[in-house]
Amino acid sequence: MFRLTQYMHQLLDPSPPRRRSRPDAVRPVVIWNLTRSCNLKCRHCYTVSADRPFPGELSHDQAMAVLRDLSDFRIPALILSGGEPMSRFDFWELAEEARRLDFRHLSLSTNGTKIDAGNVERLAGLGFDYVGISLDGIGAVNDWFRGVEGAFDQALAGVRACKAQGVKVGLRFTITEGNAHHLPAMLDLCRDEGVDKFYLSHLVYAGRGDKHRGEDTEHARTRRAMDLLIARAWQAVERGEPLEVVTGNNDADAVYFLRWAETRFAPAAVAHLRAHLQAWGGNSSGLGVGNIDPQGRVHPDTYWSDYTLGSVKERPFSAIWTGDDPILATLRTRPRPLKGRCGACAYQAVCGGNTRIRALQLTGDPWAEDPACYLSGSEIGAEGADLDRLAVTPFRGKSHDPAHRFL
């Protein structure tokens, strides 16, 4: 996640950067997909969820054991996700246990349609540090994107219910060619509803998102969206407004913002910003982020579903994460063994090579270039790198064997 607002504040009120610990000492933010079941049918769903039960998901006892292990492992944050996490049969019990174990940060990632007047007080009482609700446009655009008529109104009611109870709530918007025109209205909605955070997510080629990868935004449209997002975020910072703006799944955003700063601030301020961005390091799959899927399989992040590090049904997450898996070790290497224009990029220390899954899905090689980088070769210090760019081709099945070890 690229915390745009946070880095804007570094330009106005600088503080020393804090570098990451040694890779073997880093504890990951864990995104736990509690269930694959979901009452919506989103076009970009990386878990290919549906409104039905799925076999093999963790039992209640297994899930409770996972919580205890994660607590003992001292992870910095736990995000309960899905599917729709509130669809899981024991969601409330798991959430209560997570709060009892006193995780440093506990978040809920939900479609918002199941939050209502009948349960929001209970949700607020659990003390979630943050509730993220997905909306992919206004009204019918969101409902088309999410596959169920009325989903927008239900999710917005969930946002309002959370705000009424004092719960910190944010909106997550996945941008595509089909809904990019709604970005201004989504930002207006955040302002009008007093939403605490806006998360712009770029499309990742996983699950249904891979099948619909042809709907990914063209580079020119992505740039226009980022121009708008930066302008609105900067306006909020200058006015002292509380809205936090972040982006995800395209770490080229950090490079784009750095270049924005270069045209507006003194060299010393830009150098300070770059030091902070390099301390952050960009893509954190397998290092600062880890994933447990509904069946208990552990992955480098939520989009690496084809690559399993182990199962919490057989070994604790803590043991799997501190094991000697070769892909995990390579993901933690800096610089990563990147190829193509990513390998030639002068900003590897800022973006970390971006989202490796897009490269994997298109080429079968997780270290190939990420086609979603929207900066030109000259902008990334790689003249000529645009002559033979990796193209986003229509989905015709996987270009790699999911059992392949990617070595």
Curated annotation (Swiss-Prot):
Record note on cofactor: Binds 2 [4Fe-4S] clusters per subunit.
Transmembrane spans: none
Start and end residues of each Radical SAM core domain: 24-236
Cited PROSITE patterns: RADICAL_SAM
Pathway(s) per entry: Porphyrin-containing compound metabolism
InterPro entries noted in UniProt: Aldolase_TIM, Elp3/MiaA/NifB-like_rSAM, HemeD1_Synth_NirJ, PqqE-like, Radical_SAM_PqqE_MftC-like, rSAM
UniProt-recorded Gene Ontology molecular function terms: 4 iron, 4 sulfur cluster binding; catalytic activity; metal ion binding
Keyword Metal-binding: yes
Residues that hold [4Fe-4S] cluster 1 according to the record: 38, 42, 45
CDD domains attached to this UniProt entry: Radical_SAM (cd01335), SPASM_MftC-like (cd21123)
Biological processes annotated in GO: heme biosynthetic process
The protein's assembly and partners: Monomer.
Family (UniProt): Belongs to the radical SAM superfamily.
Annotated protein name in UniProt: Pre-heme d1 synthase
Gene: nirJ
